[in-house]
């Protein structure tokens, strides 16, 4: 019965969770692409409707990046990546609140994939902005005597970001899904409205945190010390 409530699409895949997550992620990507095409197809000088909402969202992402990186120019430069990932994370989170659907971000495979995209991209940008030697020399710190030790610490610190960013999103959304499943099973239909509101807020919050940390990691990679 529980599977019938939350895994409506599971009947198409034999309750193969990997296939279910992939299906819902492709659905999220399709929705994202549809919205992007719908907004850009008929853009107006004075935005209204969906264009107004998307422009407000992008302005918010730029403001977020400016606070995180200390530069509006850099915030705008990386806005397409951060805004796209943030939107996909939000949709992936929120779709899990619909009975019969499952949040793609409740799969560690997706959260790890998104994290690796950010991880490799900010290192790529750091190397491109500072050069290979200068970028990794920054891992050694200002004191030459302990440079090898600091380098190892920095490498471990950067690798730990993969675990913290991916597991934070995965753990929170998976927990939210299980909580909602229990509430819908034990309580009447109207009672879970408060948990729905709370979980909707958590879906937004987790997407926000993912975007903030992505901007912070990019700032640490590309912002030169003199610019602080």
From Swiss-Prot:
Database matches in HAMAP family: ATP_synth_a_bact
Lineage: Bacteria, Pseudomonadati, Campylobacterota, Epsilonproteobacteria, Campylobacterales
A GO term from the CC aspect: proton-transporting ATP synthase complex
GO biological processes: proton motive force-driven plasma membrane ATP synthesis
Family statement drawn from the similarity comment of this UniProt entry: Belongs to the ATPase A chain family.
NCBIfam families with a match to the protein in the record: ATP_synt_6_or_A, PRK05815.2-3
Organism of this sequence: Campylobacter hominis (strain ATCC BAA-381 / DSM 21671 / CCUG 45161 / LMG 19568 / NCTC 13146 / CH001A)
Location(s) in or outside the cell: Cell inner membrane
GO molecular function: proton-transporting ATP synthase activity, rotational mechanism
Pfam families given in the database record: ATP-synt_A
Name of the featured protein: ATP synthase subunit a
Topology relative to the membrane: Multi-pass membrane protein
Quaternary state and interactors: F-type ATPases have 2 components, CF(1) - the catalytic core - and CF(0) - the membrane proton channel. CF(1) has five subunits: alpha(3), beta(3), gamma(1), delta(1), epsilon(1). CF(0) has three main subunits: a(1), b(2) and c(9-12). The alpha and beta chains form an alternating ring which encloses part of the gamma chain. CF(1) is attached to CF(0) by a central stalk formed by the gamma and epsilon chains, while a peripheral stalk is formed by the delta and b chains.
Annotated transmembrane regions: 19-39, 81-101, 107-127, 136-156, 178-198, 204-224
Keywords on record: ATP synthesis, Cell inner membrane, Cell membrane, CF(0), Hydrogen ion transport, Ion transport, Membrane, Transmembrane, Transmembrane helix, Transport
Function: Key component of the proton channel; it plays a direct role in the translocation of protons across the membrane.
């Amino acid at each position: 019965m529980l599977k019938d409530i939350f895994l409506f699409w599971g009947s198409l895949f034999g309750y193969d969770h990997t296939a279910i997550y992939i299906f819902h992620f492709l659905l999220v990507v399709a929705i994202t692409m549809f919205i992007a095409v719908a907004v850009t197809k008929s853009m107006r000088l004075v935005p209204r409707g969906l264009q107004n909402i998307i422009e407000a969202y992008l302005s918010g992402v730029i403001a977020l990046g400016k606070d995180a990186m200390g530069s509006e120019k850099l915030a705008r430069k990386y806005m397409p990546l951060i805004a796209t990932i943030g939107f996909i994370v939000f949709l992936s989170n929120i779709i899990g609140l619909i009975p019969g659907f499952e949040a793609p971000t409740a799969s560690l495979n997706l959260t790890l994939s998104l994290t690796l995209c950010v991880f490799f991209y900010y290192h790529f940008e750091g190397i491109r902005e500072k050069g290979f030697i200068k970028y990794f020399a920054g891992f050694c710190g200002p004191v030459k005597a302990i440079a090898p030790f600091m380098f190892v610490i920095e490498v471990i610190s950067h690798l730990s970001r993969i675990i913290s960013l991916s597991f934070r999103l995965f753990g929170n959304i998976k927990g939210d899904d299980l909580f909602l499943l229990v509430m819908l099973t034990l309580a009447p239909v109207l009672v879970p409205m408060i948990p729905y509101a709370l979980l909707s807020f958590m879906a937004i919050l987790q997407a926000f945190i993912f975007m903030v940390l992505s901007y912070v990691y990019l700032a640490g990679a590309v912002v030169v010390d003199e610019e602080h």
